[in-house]
Regions:
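Short, low-complexity N-terminal intrinsically disordered segments enriched in polar/charged residues
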Residues: 1-31, 120-127
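A solvent-exposed, acidic/Ser-Thr-rich amphipathic alpha-helical stretch
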Residues: 3-5, 22-73, 114
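Hydrophobic pocket/interface hotspot
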Residues: 13, 25-26, 33, 46, ...
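Residue-level structural signal for beta-strand termini and adjacent loop
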Residues: 49, 82, 108-110
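Short, surface-exposed coil-to-beta transition loops
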Residues: 62-64, 87-94
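Short beta-strand segments that buttress and anchor functional surface loops
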Residues: 77-85
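Short beta-strand edge/turn micro-motifs at domain boundaries
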Residues: 92-123
Length: 127
């Protein structure tokens, strides 16, 4: 699959995710795809389980913003923010493609936090 085609598939995937379209969102995954959440130690085996897990999430997102997609060849990274009941969850998704579909995904999640005062002299602020 060409990089342009992968990028189009990713755009479709994230748009479907933002819209809550579970069927289209999960078309990007191979049937035997594996998704890991390193922070919790969880591994989700197979597209069916991944779609079921996401379909049963107790909090529906109130916002979804893709900040950046970058990649080359078969490895792509997406940075995005999901809002759950006013809480922003900053997310990084690493996807590995085989035969045009995601075979492996790793996702990292972090809530927003206040910047420590001691760093103020060396940093700027977004926004």
């Amino acid at each position: 699959m060409e990089e342009h085609d992968i990028r189009m598939a990713l755009d479709r995937h994230w748009a479907a995710s933002a819209a809550g379209d579970q069927v289209v969102e999960h078309e990007i995954y191979q049937d035997h795809a594996v998704c890991t959440y390193p922070q919790s130690g969880e591994v989700i085996y197979g597209r069916h389980n991944l779609q079921a897990l996401r379909s049963h999430h107790p909090g529906k997102p109130s916002g979804f913003e893709v900040r950046r997609i970058t990649g080359e060849g078969n490895v792509w990274v997406t940075e995005y923010v999901i809002d759950y009941a006013g809480e922003s969850v900053y997310t990084v998704s690493l996807m590995e493609f085989v035969d045009g579909q995601v075979s492996r995904e790793t996702q990292y999640f972090s809530n927003a936090f206040d910047a420590p005062a001691w760093r103020a002299q060396w940093v700027g602020r977004e926004g």
